[in-house]
């Protein structure tokens, strides 16, 4: 397994809309290795979710593990939200927008349909943190970041803060 480089805002590749994954590709050994590498990268970061677009793979899949023990890895390939209910405000962060956290309103409960890592169709009802994480990672697959939900003024403040962090790091 290998750690993959994570793209960081404002990298324009984060704005790319991902394409669907074919079932034949899902079961290939190279795709399975990529999934394993994504989990390793997510856990090492550390994070609870990672979309393929964040590692410069522009296909519709993501890996998630919101468990405390990091022992419930979940794969979502070609995910689609079937229903959304209620609203919740959650403070989100992102591996592609390091050091930034902001309140984002998302659906409280969702039903998502997807393929699992074996190419089998699944449907899952998710609430709370898992629902937030699924919606956040699905946004990445559409080229959207959590900071896009912020006002233009707050987004500009985030951009300046990240530029300052980068200057300090170099």
Curated annotation (Swiss-Prot):
One family name in Pfam for this protein: Pep_deformylase
Active site, renumbered: 137
GO biological process: co-translational protein modification; translation
Coiled coil: none
EC class (word): hydrolase
GO MF term set: metal ion binding; peptide deformylase activity
Domain of life from the UniProt record: Bacteria
Needed cofactors: Fe(2+)
Job of this protein: Removes the formyl group from the N-terminal Met of newly synthesized proteins. Requires at least a dipeptide for an efficient rate of reaction. N-terminal L-methionine is a prerequisite for activity but the enzyme has broad specificity at other positions.
InterPro entries given in the database record: Peptide_deformylase, Peptide_deformylase_sf
The UniProt record lists the keyword Phosphoprotein: no
Cofactor note: Binds 1 Fe(2+) ion.
Gene name as annotated: def
Annotated catalysed reactions: N-terminal N-formyl-L-methionyl-[peptide] + H2O = N-terminal L-methionyl-[peptide] + formate
Family: Belongs to the polypeptide deformylase family.
EC assignment: 3.5.1.88
Keyword Signal: no
Residues the record lists as binding Fe cation: 94, 136, 140
Name the record gives this protein: Peptide deformylase
Keyword annotations: Hydrolase, Iron, Metal-binding, Protein biosynthesis
């Amino acid at each position: 397994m290998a750690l993959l480089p994570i793209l960081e805002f404002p990298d324009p590749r984060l704005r790319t809309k991902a394409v669907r994954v074919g079932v034949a590709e899902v079961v290939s050994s190279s795709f399975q290795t990529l999934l394993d590498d994504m989990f390793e990268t997510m856990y090492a970061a550390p994070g609870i979710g990672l979309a393929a677009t964040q590692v410069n793979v522009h296909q519709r899949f993501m890996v998630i593990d919101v468990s405390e023990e990091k022992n419930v890895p979940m794969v979502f390939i070609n995910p689609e939200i079937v229903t959304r209910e209620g609203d919740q405000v959650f403070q989100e962060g992102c591996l592609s927008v390091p050091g930034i956290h902001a309140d984002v309103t998302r659906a409280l409960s969702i039903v998502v349909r997807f393929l699992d890592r074996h190419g089998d169709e699944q449907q899952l009802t998710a609430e709370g943190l898992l629902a937030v994480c699924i919606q956040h990672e699905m946004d990445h697959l559409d080229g959207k970041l959590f900071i896009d939900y912020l006002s233009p003024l707050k987004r500009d403040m985030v951009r300046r803060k990240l530029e300052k962090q980068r200057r300090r790091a170099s």
